[in-house]
Structures are given as C-alpha cells and as structure tokens.
Amino acid sequence: MGNVPAKEGRSRSSTFSGTGAEIVTRSARRNTTSSADVKKSSRKSEEKDRLREKHWRDLVVRLHENVDGGYLAPYGTYKSNLDFDTEVVRRLVINRQLAPFYTPLNDFDPTWTTEELLVILSQLPLHSIEDAYSDAESEEDDVDNHKIHKSNNYYRRQEQKRKLKHSMETAKQAQKEEETALLHQKMLLKQGGQVSSSLPSKDLLLRLYSDASECPICFLYYPSNLNISRCCLQPICTECFVQIKRLDPHPPHDDASNQPNGDSLPHTLISEPAHCPYCAMADFGVIYDPLSDLRTGINGKCSPGEYRMPEHSDAKSDVQSVKKRPRRKSMAATDPGIITVDNIRPDWEQKLISAKNKLARKAAAASAIHASNLILNGDDSQTSSQQSRLRSRNSGGQTYNTIEERMIEEALRLSLLDEEERRRKERENSSKD
C-alpha cells in the first residue's frame, strides 16, 4: 500500500482542497454581489436625478400650458416647500378638480376702469423669477465645512447640493426664455401683428379679473373662482394650498420620548394629517367648482386668445353671479371631488416608513456599541480568586450570549422591515406600469 496515502493524510488533503475551493467560490460570489449592488445603486441614483430634473421642469410656467386663464405651475409667491407631486397637481388642474395657478394682483380696486385694469394686467409676468429664486443661489453652511477631516456623508451632501443647484439654474433659465417669448407676443399685439392663440384675450382677462377676490392667506388678489375648504368653506388659492402638508414623522405629543434628549422608539413615530388653516380641522382638503361657461386652453372649448364674452353680457355681473351660487355644506375628506393634502403628496406613507427604518437602524447601532462596551468591560475585570474568575467568565458568557441574541433579533427585524418596503415599492411600480 506504499503509494496510497495514510487515512489522516487523505482527510487533511481533501479538507484543504475543499476549503480552498469554498474560499474561491465565496470570493467570486462576493465580487458578483458587490458588482450587482453597485449597478443597482447607480440605476437608483440615475432615476432619482431624472425625477428631480422633471420636478423642476414642471415648475416652469409656460404660456401654452393654459387652463381657463391660469397655468399648471405656481407663480412663485413662495420660495420653499415646492415638494408636492407636480404630476398629480398638473393632472388635477387639467381635469378642473383644482383651480389653476392664476397670476395674482398685488392690489385691486373695484373703482378701476376697464382700461386701467387692462393696463395693469398687460404688465403681469408669467412668474415671479426674482422672488422665487432669490434664495436659490445662497447655500447653507454645512456643519462639516470647518472640519479638517470630512466624512463621506459630507461629500455626498455636497454632490446633492450641486445637482439641486444645477436643476434650479436650468429651471430658472427655462423660465426666463418663457418670459422673453411672452414679451415678444405682447410687442406683436401692440404692433397689430399675428400673435399666438395662447396669449389670453382682453375678454378673458376682464372675465377673470373684473371682480377679483383676496386670498385670506397670502393677501393677493385672484379671479373669484378659487378653491373652497371642505370644512369651513373658506377660499384659498392653489399657490397656498400646495404649501400645506403633513408634519414630519415624530413621536406622539404625549410621549415622554418626545422631550429633548429623549430616545424615540421606531414604532411610535406618527405622521399627523394637515389641519385647516382656518378652523384647524384635520385632513384638510378643498373642492373646486370650475366656471361652466369658461373652458379655455387645455381640454377647453377654445384657446385663450379666441375667447370672446357673449354679447349683451358684462364681466362684473357674470362674476357676481358666480359669487351668488348656492352655498355648499361642509364635506368629509373622503367625499368625491375633495382634494386633500395627501392627494398631492402621496409619498407621505413612504416617508413615515423610511423614518421608522432610519430610527431602527440608529437604535441597532447604539445597541451594538453598548454591547461591545459591556464585553470589553467584562474582559478587563479581574478577580482575586479562581472561583470568582470562573463565575465572572460564566456570567460574561451569558451576557455575551444574551447580547448576541438581541443583536440577531434586531437584525432580523430590520431585514423584515427592508423586505416589506421593497415589496411595497414593487407593488407601486407595477401599479404605475
């Protein structure tokens, strides 16, 4: 049996070969998984950038995107909180379920003559560029700017700021081009030339602004057919409505962890519904009654430039008849036709889940650090006798096992949360498709 290796030699050689193959296999698997994760992260980042660019493009007021004398994008009264779903809002305005973004007047006097009113209206821009973008170029000071060693999160934040600034600059430039086109159309109108049918006619402007109403929140004047709050029936312009949203996820107000330096549990986070700015009723929503005889622009009967007021009619009397329509009763948030704050920000549930997951990961990291400190403290402790050392070793082992079990349970719980979020995203994507 000279050439046959001994039993011990065969087992060791086989074990070594098997172990080496397993190491190579694991290494290849890790490399494949790492490459797949990088590609997935890259696709996710590209999709996020694409959605951000689209969001800012949708915030540009365009002359041809006209609905009943208003537009699909805000005028620029506010500089912040433009994080509503622009695609949802545009669809609601086109379907006449939400009042369009009308160009506001800073003041209104019912004694103005028709000529005086038309002069003021002819000077209005599409968008208040300087007010809306005045703070866009000023950057907030990052907490890590003055540190010698920058964290990875710092460079990630700087990259996000750079992309956001680029999106804002692109939108600002596009808005300037729209303003230039509007001025060109107004010049052609004065010279008696052929103008675009998207330029509102004098009849349309007088029909809308002859008896303008004040929005009680921004104190600007708009056409009288504004949105009405579902609860207390107060008018509110769309520019103000899209500013209202839920509070960020937070612990309940009666929770002790809501105090400063309190430790919040992930499952206790809540997202409170938005309240009416007038009567403070929860689940704020509005209803909009479009003028039946005024359908111009997108999905309308005629273009804005082709609108003509019926003969023997007066703009002020027509608007006053609108104001005298039968008064509605308060309606529930779930009634048909009610547009709530959650309708224009449908991602509030996702934000709540993300906040809970983030807090859970933070708690898990804190638990791991605490556990490692306990283990190190246990290793450093010494006793005077062999018996006490044995008791300490046994106690330390039990503590280690208990901590390890808790960490495993926490990891499993986080894994289940991530899997639930992944499945929910897949369902949303499949429903969109």
Swiss-Prot record:
Its annotated compartments are: Cytoplasm
GO cellular component annotations, sorted alphabetically? cytoplasm
Q: Name one GO biological process term.
A: cellular response to glucose starvation
Q: Where are the compositionally biased (Low complexity) regions?
A: 377-395
User: The organism sits in which domain of life?
Assistant: Eukaryota
Q: Where is the region Disordered?
A: 1-49, 305-334, 377-404
Q: Where is the composition biased (Basic and acidic residues)?
A: 37-49, 308-317
For this protein, the record's InterPro entries field holds:
Sip5/DA2
Keywords (A to Z) from UniProt: Cytoplasm
Q: What PANTHER family does UniProt report for this protein, alphabetically?
A: PROTEIN SIP5 (PTHR31315:SF1)
Q: What does this protein do?
A: May negatively regulate the SNF1 kinase.
Q: Which family does it belong to?
A: Belongs to the SIP5 family.
> Which protein, by its recorded name, is this?
Protein SIP5
Q: Which species does the entry assign this protein to?
A: Meyerozyma guilliermondii (strain ATCC 6260 / CBS 566 / DSM 6381 / JCM 1539 / NBRC 10279 / NRRL Y-324)
Gene encoding the protein? SIP5
